[in-house]
Design a protein with these regions (language model features):
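Donor nucleotide-sugar binding loop of glycosyltransferases
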Residues: 27-30, 58, 85, 111
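A conserved acidic beta->alpha catalytic loop
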Residues: 55-63, 108
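Short loop->beta transition adjacent to catalytic acidic/histidine clusters or analogous donor-positioning motifs
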Residues: 16-19, 39-53, 61, 72-75
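N-proximal low-complexity "stem/linker" segments adjacent to membrane-targeting elements
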Residues: 2-40, 47
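Conserved donor nucleotide-binding strand/loop of the catalytic core
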Residues: 49-52, 63-95
Length: 249
């Protein structure tokens, strides 16, 4: 267990097949609507699931709103301080007993139907396919977001292509589903707390022989992201050190 966090879970009688982790930071304005949207989509698709909202530090009423959400399949994990998306997702992955586990950004800028697409592909694939991951550059993706984000994203993708031996076009889109057995192999070794977490996770899964399927996504960008030139530079620096770490280990 991670020191410095508490969890509130509600009982459910049917063992789910999919655990969805939603890292959340100050999402009180949208979390209730997003959870209703997520639950309806998964129910309509006939997917048995549990959803874990990991609130990445105090600051608003996100946690209390999740606790009050009227569905026993939704739980909340509260972190005592803001530690980063990677730490939040790792915390949500802990003690998972479902066959599949994934994560999606809590604001649902990415349409949650991608989770159903990813799950179907994993079910129909062999065990060597460890994950199905969203890709904004997939030819069937529907993506509209600001030029500044496009520039940062394009530069970052080129940087990743140079520094890492991954045959993937997009490592950072916040919608991914994995086989839990794959996650179990690498979870104890994961170190990254920030946005570079996705890249570390994929690299370590690839080292363990797992393959990936890239899937299209629909992105409805709501213009509230904190990603800018400064955070882009910070991400590049963190990714540079991750490349060095992975080469040495």
């Amino acid at each position: 267990m991670v020191v410095g966090s508490t969890s509130t879970a509600k009982s459910d009688f049917m063992k789910p097949e999919l655990t969805i982790v939603l890292p959340a930071y100050r999402e009180e304005a949208t979390i209730e609507v997003c959870l209703h949207r997520l639950v309806k989509l998964l129910d309509d698709k006939g997917i048995s699931f549990e959803a874990r909202v990991v609130v990445d530090g105090p600051g608003d009423q996100t946690a209390s709103m999740v606790r009050a959400f009227p569905d026993s399949r939704v739980s909340v994990i509260e972190l005592e301080r803001n530690t980063g998306k990677g730490f939040a997702v790792r915390r949500g992955f802990e003690d998972c007993t479902t066959e599949f586990i994934g994560f999606i950004d809590a604001d649902l800028d990415l349409h949650p139907e991608g989770l159903a697409i990813a799950l179907d592909l994993l079910k129909s694939s062999g065990p060597q396919v460890g994950g199905a991951i969203g890709s904004k550059v997939h030819p069937k993706s529907n993506v509209e977001y600001p030029l500044s984000r496009r520039v940062i994203s394009s530069f970052y993708k080129k940087f990743v292509k140079i520094g890492f031996s991954l045959d993937l076009n997009d490592t950072q889109t916040g919608l991914k589903v994995f086989r839990s057995e794959a996650i179990d192999k690498v979870l104890p070794t994961l170190k990254c707390n920030g946005f570079e977490f996705d890249l570390e996770l994929l690299c370590k899964l690839a080292r363990n022989g797992f393959l990936f399927i890239e899937i299209p996504v629909d992105l409805d960008y709501k213009f509230k992201s904190t990603v800018n030139i400064r955070t882009g530079i910070k991400a590049l620096v963190s990714t540079f050190w991750l490349a060095i770490y992975l080469r040495r280990n």
